[in-house]
Amino acid sequence: LVDQNTRELVDEDIAWADFVLVSAMVIHREEVARLAERCHEQARPLIGGGPLFHAETDTPLGVDHVVVGEAEEVAADLVADMRRGRVRPRYEATRYPDLGLTPQPRWDLAHLEDYATMSVQSCRGCPFDCEFCDVVVLNGRKPRYKSPDQFVGELETLRDLGWRGPVFVVDDNFVGNRRRCRELLRAVIDWRARTGARMTFL
């Protein structure tokens, strides 16, 4: 796993892989095009996902395969096709996944020392339609939630990996459902009291 915001991608990283996967936002458009050139120079197929490919599904920027939508819905099919060596040009999620079934992020693959904050998420989707925001297009109008236990479990995993810095909650709308927000905050307060964790939340 290479985060090009914090580390340089070297040719050996590409040569090692059977497939190269990139998750990108719209601002990363030029970097993705350069990555595609590097992958093709080493005859490695590039699979793209993330908001960039939702916005530019007709212009894949040299990417060989595109995943549109939230990965939970298509990941199993994509991995099975990769194993068979028959990856389709396009995979598109047709519904929004149940976040209660979402596995924990693999923070153990990241270089935690490279980061000032770590990101966690307890919900996706938003009932509002603000003109400056594309959340409704990307993640839907109906909020979907992780359970308080699931969210606290992710915090516990970060703590077990040695993370003691700030945690950035990257929800689409953290306070949209006030009752659920209070339940989540109570669970976090109880966890902090039980474990002595002193994470700062942003």
Model-identified regions with their sequence ranges:
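Glycine-rich beta-alpha loop elements in corrinoid/cobalamin-binding modules
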Residues: 1-100
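Radical SAM [4Fe-4S] cluster-binding motif and immediate context
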Residues: 103-202
